[in-house]
Design a protein with these regions (language model features):
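C-terminal and inter-domain tail/linker signature
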Residues: 1-167
Length: 167
């Protein structure tokens, strides 16, 4: 990992003299974890690791077919630009922008070829040099809007108990 390939936010965090040795190691672990394909991330996590996702999880619930979920084929040219990062003790928080081209299924939304730019926030808890827990929130409404799927959702029939009906 070279600092010239890192975002200014990560460079600032790594250069922070107030970081402890543990905090610097935790940040470097998260950066290594994020730098490899999804299939190769297990070596950075505890056994049985399962991240908590909010945002994409809602889209997954709409279409539970495992063949139509999000994977490396969904946005194959995906890049993540870290906008901000905070490290404190055993926690690392980051905000990043996912950018790329929608060329594979995203939770049932067929490939559109459209460019996407979506904000995501993540938090990782480190234990004994491995990621023990992680939580992520992605702006799924921005994603479905950019993929052209918003019109179908916005015009879907609503029940009388839907709070948006009377607004």
């Amino acid at each position: 990992m070279t600092s010239d390939t890192l975002s200014p936010a990560v460079q600032r965090a790594l250069a922070d003299p107030a970081l402890t040795h543990e905090e610097r190691a935790n940040l470097e672990l998260v950066l290594r974890f994020r730098s490899v394909p999804f299939a190769d991330r297990d070596k950075y996590t505890v056994d049985g690791f399962r991240p908590s996702r909010i945002g994409m999880a809602t889209l997954a619930a709409l279409n539970p077919d495992p063949g139509l979920r999000y994977d490396g084929r969904s946005i194959p040219d995906r890049t993540d630009r870290i906008l901000d990062v905070i490290v404190h003790g055993d926690r690392v928080w980051a905000t990043w922008l996912i950018e790329g081209t929608h060329l594979g299924h995203v939770y049932g939304i067929p490939p559109t070829g459209r460019a996407v730019s979506v904000l995501e926030v993540g938090q990782w808890r480190i234990e004994n040099g491995l990621i023990a827990e992680a939580w992520f929130f992605v702006d799924e409404l921005a994603l479905i809007h950019q993929l052209g799927a918003w019109d179908g959702l916005a015009s879907a029939p609503r029940g009388a108990d839907d709070p948006g009906v009377n607004q």
